[in-house]
């Protein structure tokens, strides 16, 4: 019997009894209240439901929103949280601001949107099906739900398809432990799969000596394809086929010829692209991470050194929006094996038979101290190498000066370089500021091999705003549209006089940027060239109160600090007349100019070029083994952090020179690195302000006019081999392989 019939039978007797007891009169009483007469008042009088208090959330990855115009802000709701984001933000970005981490494989914040992995599906109110949050723009009032059963089921289904052809070989995969596919399959995937057919396999591709490929693991996210074309500026990778036959590779078998190719290892979310030199060496949880900086060029890219015990195992990039973003060059990433080859571990003295023998520090310093007093003060020369830190250069300068000589300089600072005004050797626009330029004039520099991360900024700007690029110098290969204007000073003269066709574009540019290579400092007519460059800058509104587009791209990590500290060659003939030469890591000095009867002390960490001319060898620590201050090409001061212990009996550079000063009878007045930095503060205060950029205060208007004439000699290539530029890279087996395989490629 139904519940409805049972209820009606139960109610009927009671209703009949009620009818029998009532009279025939019907009374109706109406009670009127003010709330009933006004619906608005009634709504106000009703108690409001209690407001749900949501727990606070923090933006994902420290995401921050900046509104250039408050009217461009729109409000969306993410899981009930009201969030204001700028117009043009995607749903995924809005979720990150709201503190929700959306899973993704194909999306990368620095690459274009592909929307092909579908892992970022979320539910949007009034949408018939889940939407890809990476490609969907956020709209005003949009209500986004990220944790509903529909969104969870959609992601679970996507993950099942992604794992359908994946080999699931995590135990032998180098990506294990830092794999996005591992993490997201655990968090968003199912605990079982329904695929029982045979899995496909893909032939591995040969991309060169740096990147290892296991293409069967590839999930076709196309991050590497987009990175190659959008950031590296090369069209080496592409996608072939469709459906289950889809794969990533090169249409014609070739190597990846970019100087940034190693970055595809970091952005690959699976183990399809891994480091070939690091293969099967270590797991990430076995490594100790140390945040430091790179010294292979003058950019000062932020890096993380992963070590195990006394050995550096790998180098990976560290985020710094102002310098290298999250990319590093292949030279920075893979030169680490040079830190354990050809190292100098003990003090040595050349014997009478021409061979070196190991001695104690006391004996080595005693020999040097005796010899230095046997020569005249003006015959003493000190040269700092391109990898020297500010502390060691300051101590070397003080020591040589106390010995009565002014002949102390750093590699790359030739005689006659004007270091009185910092604007004349710094990148005044700043590296990140290059993105605001709409025209580039490159003079005697090839950023692709001299400073790969500066070149990446230029490439990014050209792609984003179609900025024009003009180049004056020897023929070179660029990875963006560039017009070759000429090869030398004659072209500069035409531009300065307004006779060159490029002058029209230069005149019409709103924010023109001129980048001058530091290789011009070694020319005899450098002052005339720089004067011509400054006249071009003044005539074309390159330098003004709101924009300084006059830039100098330095070549070495030690160059900027050396110029700040005054390590400048006084005479071009100083080396040829020297009787005592102190080379502190200076391997690119022309040792043929050193007299045969001169006594040479080599202080450094590698047995490189100059060590064969040395009479005494003093072992020093490398940049991964010491704390030192460096200033990059834009004037940004940073410090290295020791990641591994020193090799053998090596010591820090400044400590060696400080001990030598005491043995030589000219004891320097500091015993700690803090004391050295106090001395630096009195000479160049900007070098003690770590992680800050000190811009140049003055411009070309204060510089006197140069009367010299420019030579007609064309500009020369500064970097002949991108992979072999200092003692560490020259000792690297990986860099030697790259040089052998890629030497015939255009960019080297």
Curated annotation (Swiss-Prot):
Cross-referenced SMART domains, in alphabetical order?
NADH-G_4Fe-4S_3
One Pfam family matching this protein: NADH_dhqG_C
Span of domain 4Fe-4S Mo/W bis-MGD-type: 287-343
Provide the GO MF annotations for this entry: 2 iron, 2 sulfur cluster binding; 4 iron, 4 sulfur cluster binding; metal ion binding; NADH dehydrogenase (ubiquinone) activity
Residues of the transit peptide:
1-33
The reaction(s) this protein catalyses: a ubiquinone + NADH + 5 H(+)(in) = a ubiquinol + NAD(+) + 4 H(+)(out)
- Domain (2Fe-2S ferredoxin-type): give its ranges: 72-150
PROSITE patterns on file:
2FE2S_FER_2, 4FE4S_HC3, 4FE4S_MOW_BIS_MGD, COMPLEX1_75K_1, COMPLEX1_75K_2, COMPLEX1_75K_3
Which Gene Ontology CC terms are recorded?
chloroplast; mitochondrial inner membrane; mitochondrial membrane; mitochondrion; plastid; respiratory chain complex I
* Protein residues bound to [2Fe-2S] cluster: 106, 117, 120, 134
Q: How is the cofactor bound?
A: Binds 1 [2Fe-2S] cluster per subunit.
InterPro entries for the chain: 2Fe-2S_ferredoxin-like_sf (IPR036010), 2Fe-2S_ferredoxin-type (IPR001041), Mopterin_OxRdtase (IPR006656), Mopterin_OxRdtase_4Fe-4S_dom (IPR006963), NADH_UbQ_OxRdtase_75kDa_su_CS (IPR000283), NADH_UbQ_OxRdtase_ferredoxin (IPR054351), NADH_UbQ_OxRdtase_Gsu (IPR010228), NADH_UbQ_OxRdtase_Gsu_4Fe4S-bd (IPR019574)
Task: Give the family from UniProt.
Answer: Belongs to the complex I 75 kDa subunit family.
Q: How does it assemble?
A: Complex I is composed of at least 49 different subunits. This is a component of the iron-sulfur (IP) fragment of the enzyme.
Name of the protein this chain belongs to: NADH dehydrogenase [ubiquinone] iron-sulfur protein 1, mitochondrial
Species of origin reads Arabidopsis thaliana (Mouse-ear cress)
